[in-house]
């Protein structure tokens, strides 16, 4: 860890605009050739452009980046491509295998960062990675969303005229996975993950969370706001908030990148009289430990 933190990191923006153009290329093209084809099985994947933008802005080569719920390893892969070291944790064994294959693939493509990977419950991350306490420059992660925002289809054109089939939109049936918890359980578990991850931060390190509003039984839920409140209860203070575009930008207009099922759910909500819109961005929330801010006064 060759970079010594400075006071400026507490307010560092690295000249980022408030709206990040992270959807210029479709997600499929962002991953093509950089991740294994099997990675598409995961129901919720962070855009590689979001991960690389955050890592490039808030860390230096040689720094440590951690993702406590790493999925297919997007955060880790982008980190080691940018000459950062990475450590990740994933609950489901099958996804750990996907992450490991992606990391090996990254090294085969010339990535030089080192990595560590563990299979387990992210609520125990501070114990599993106790040797990393006080060393991470950045924790970058995202909570799981509902299955209505994820998945791929086989249309009637692909399956001989049959019905539209949805696949790759669910996690395993293991009830220990936070994706299966009610909203209160999800937030409680995510709060414990944030608290544990904060213990791994070096002084003035950053916790970054990507999150979007969701609908539960038709009701729009301000999940970003709830994550901010949850973080505050666990000693993390919101420092910055950005819009990371899922859509593209062309000639001052948005280019739709919405998935089939996001559009379908939006139409269904509108048919029920709900003023629903397809999501064009994720909130990127940056936090610092309250203790770091207090110590700087």
Tell where the protein language model's regions lie, with residue ranges.
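Class I S-adenosyl-L-methionine-dependent methyltransferase catalytic core
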Residues: 1-297
């Amino acid at each position: 860890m060759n970079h010594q933190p400075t006071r400026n990191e507490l307010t560092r923006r690295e000249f980022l605009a408030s709206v990040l153009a992270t959807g210029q290329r479709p997600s499929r093209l962002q991953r093509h050739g950089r991740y294994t084809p099997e990675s598409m099985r995961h129901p919720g994947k962070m855009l590689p452009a979001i991960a690389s933008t955050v890592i490039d802005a808030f860390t230096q080569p040689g720094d440590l980046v951690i993702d406590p719920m790493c999925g297919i390893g997007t955060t880790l892969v982008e980190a080691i491509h940018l000459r950062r070291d990475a450590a990740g944790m994933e609950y489901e064994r099958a996804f750990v295998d996907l992450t490991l294959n992606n990391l090996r693939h990254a090294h085969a493509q010339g990535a030089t960062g080192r990595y560590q990977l563990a299979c387990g419950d992210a609520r125990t991350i501070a114990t599993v990675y106790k040797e990393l306490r006080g060393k991470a420059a950045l924790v970058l992660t995202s909570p799981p969303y509902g299955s209505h925002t994820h998945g791929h289809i086989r249309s009637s054109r692909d399956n001989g005229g049959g019905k539209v089939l949805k696949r790759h939109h669910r996690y395993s049936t293991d009830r220990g996975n936070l994706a299966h918890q009610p909203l209160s359980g999800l937030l409680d578990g995510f709060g414990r993950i944030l608290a544990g991850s904060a213990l791994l931060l070096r002084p003035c390190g950053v916790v970054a969370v990507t999150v979007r509003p969701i609908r539960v039984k038709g009701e729009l839920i301000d999940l970003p706001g709830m994550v901010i409140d949850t973080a505050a209860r666990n000693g993390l203070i919101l420092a910055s908030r950005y819009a990371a575009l899922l859509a593209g930008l062309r000639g001052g207009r948005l280019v739709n990148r919405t998935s089939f099922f996001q559009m379908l759910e939006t139409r269904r909500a509108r048919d029920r009289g709900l003023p629903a819109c397809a999501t064009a961005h994720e909130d990127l929330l940056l936090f610092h430990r309250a203790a770091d801010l207090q110590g700087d006064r």
